[in-house]
């Protein structure tokens, strides 16, 4: 259970990082 939970947590972080970077980049471009 512990290993699978860590894998899911890492997968969520890896999935969110590009979205956060794209959001920041979009805000900078909108200026």
From Swiss-Prot:
**Its domain of life?**
Eukaryota
Can you supply a Gene Ontology BP term from the record?
photosynthesis
Q: Which UniProt keywords apply?
A: Chloroplast, Membrane, Photosynthesis, Photosystem I, Plastid, Thylakoid, Transmembrane, Transmembrane helix
Where does the sequence pass through the membrane? 7-26
Membrane association type = Single-pass membrane protein
Q: Where in the cell is it found?
A: Plastid, Chloroplast thylakoid membrane
User: Which InterPro entries does the record cross-reference, listed alphabetically?
Assistant: PSI_PsaM, PSI_PsaM_sf
GO cellular component, alphabetical, reads: chloroplast thylakoid membrane; photosystem I
Coiled-coil portions:
none
Q: Give the family, as the similarity comment puts it.
A: Belongs to the PsaM family.
This chain's protein is named: Photosystem I reaction center subunit XII
Q: Which gene encodes it?
A: psaM
């Amino acid at each position: 259970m512990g290993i699978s939970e860590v894998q899911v947590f890492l997968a969520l972080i890896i999935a969110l990082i590009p979205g956060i970077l794209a959001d920041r980049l979009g805000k900078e471009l909108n200026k």
